[in-house]
Structure formats: C-alpha cells, structure tokens
Amino acid sequence: MKAALLYEGKAKKVYQSSEDEHQLVLSYKNDATAFNGEKKSQFEGKGRLNNEISSLIFQRLHEAGISTHFIKRLDSTQQIVQKTSIIPLEVVIRNLATGSITKRLGIKEKVSFTPPLLELFYKDDALGDPLINDEHALLLTDITETELAEIKDKAREVNAALQEIFQSIGIKLVDFKLEFGRNKDGEILLSDEVSPDTCRLWDIETNEKLDKDVFRQGTGDLITVYQEILNRLEVHV
C-alpha cells in the first residue's frame, strides 16, 4: 500500500500510496516529544493508540459533516488519507485556560473562554512556531482572506463536534490544535491527526489529565491514559 517515504515528523511517517497518486499512508510512531523536541521518549503501543483514536474521531467528524483528509484505517498503526498540501498554520482552539496562555497573558488557570478562543501559530520549527495574527498569516502563507475565514469557521465547527464527542464519554475538551491542507481540487480539509497528542483532555469528574501533558509534566503513564481515551471512545462512539 505504501511506496516512497515522503516525510518523517515527530509522531508520524508519511508515505506515498502505491495505489493512488492522490493518497498517502500515515504511519504512527511510538515517539513522544515535548517542549519543541527538547524532551523525547518512546512508548511501546503509542502509535497504535493514536492511530485508532484519530481514526475513530475522524469517522465521527465525517458523520457530523466535516470534511477531513481521512479515508480509512489500514492496520493497527497506519491509515490512508487524501494527499493535501499542508498550510503552515496551527490553529489552536481554547475552551479553558491552561498551559502557555496562562503564562503569556496572566489568565487564571481553568478560566472558561466564551466564545472559545482561537489562536494562529506559524509552523516553523526554527522560529519555535510563533503566535501570529491574521495579517501575518496572509503574509507568511499563500492563503487568501476568504480561505483564512474558512479555516477559522471549520476549526470552530470541529470544536463544537469534538466537545459533543468528548462530553459523551465524560471528558472536557480543554484545548487542541488543528492543521489544514488543500487536496488536488483545492478543497481545504482538516488534516494531520486528532488525538491525545494534539488535544488537552480532562476527566469531567476528577480533572485528571488524559493527554500528553502526563508526559510533559511527568505526572503519569502516557500509555495508560491514551488507552483510557480509546476505551471510552470504543464504548460510546
């Protein structure tokens, strides 16, 4: 199913599909990184968990009418997706205050954002993925004002759908990051992944962290909390 390796990132390898030039094979790795790659480790089974979690969530997003690059899960660690040209922006949606924004703006932990706060970051490892505004986004990428508005609207739609999904399994969607890309027809699709690597997820009852923060902060076992997310999704999704 896969041919040449096109790109290797922190969490996935991207291969050209051997069966369709407009499709890719994403292979999820067991690597975990934090603090822009300064903290690194490997966890047996992490790639499988993220692949299964992201596949389930993309399926639910499709059911909610949201266009994504996801086609199907190929095996335990791989999925087939539409080939997209990734737009070098990370779109972050924050429903509750935690992490960098509390330090950057002095906002108290767990403050609720109503409406949810949307932030843009420029994807550039050398620059540390800086926070940017709309005008920066138009300057630094090839997107138009109309496309930027579309990306923001899609991100908010994804947030609403994800909040419903996670609330149904007893989890608060605190914040998350998204990436978008254009397919061969120029359609903007949600790309990359949606998993505990890219979302902050807290148990509704206990506020226990069920995401990569347990690795960042050294407060728990990553595989245990990722498996908990998958278990809940498999029962309720």
From Swiss-Prot:
Its EC number is 6.3.2.6. Belongs to the SAICAR synthetase family. The lineage of its organism: Bacteria, Bacillati, Bacillota, Bacilli, Bacillales. The keyword Ribonucleoprotein does not apply. Disulfide bonds: none annotated. Signal peptide: none annotated. GO terms for biological process: 'de novo' IMP biosynthetic process; cobalamin biosynthetic process. PROSITE patterns: SAICAR_SYNTHETASE_1 (PS01057), SAICAR_SYNTHETASE_2 (PS01058). InterPro entries: SAICAR_synt/ADE2_N, SAICAR_synt_PurC, SAICAR_synth, SAICAR_synthetase, SAICAR_synthetase_CS. It comes from Oceanobacillus iheyensis (strain DSM 14371 / CIP 107618 / JCM 11309 / KCTC 3954 / HTE831). This is Phosphoribosylaminoimidazole-succinocarboxamide synthase. It comes from the Bacteria. It catalyses: 5-amino-1-(5-phospho-D-ribosyl)imidazole-4-carboxylate + L-aspartate + ATP = (2S)-2-[5-amino-1-(5-phospho-beta-D-ribosyl)imidazole-4-carboxamido]succinate + ADP + phosphate + 2 H(+).
